[in-house]
Amino acid sequence: MYMQERSSQGITLVPLESKLLSKRKIFLEGEINGGLAMEFIRQLMCLVGEDPKAPIRILINSAGGEINSGMLIYDAIQSCKTPLKLYCLGRAYSMAALIFASGSPGKRYLFANSELMVHEPLLGNGVSGNSTSIQMVSESLLEARDKINKILQ
């Protein structure tokens, strides 16, 4: 999506995402996966590099996604010294809710009709294997659940 920008040289089309990023706004939307996590971290690093003291707004509208990718975003937010403001626009479910909750108290904003939802970690599609491998997956899910619960306390 593009927007028009007027200048002395006429009208140019500017990608909307670039314009929002120049206003220090990062959108976290759609399924949380490895690609989205790395894109988020690249954008965060660019904005921190430009001005480490100017606040960054993170706008979330996501049904969640992969645990590992969500934890990567969580870790990036926790390690960031730049002031962050997190906004829930519409929904923050599952890992997106954890990411929203990772913001500092007083710096998290929930729009009036937005929703948060947290649930126990779920198995991914196509899980198969012998009893030992299924037990290992189950133990991994329980560990993830405990880690998430500890973060949310």
Residue ranges and their predicted role:
Residues M1-Q153:
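Terminal-region recognition feature
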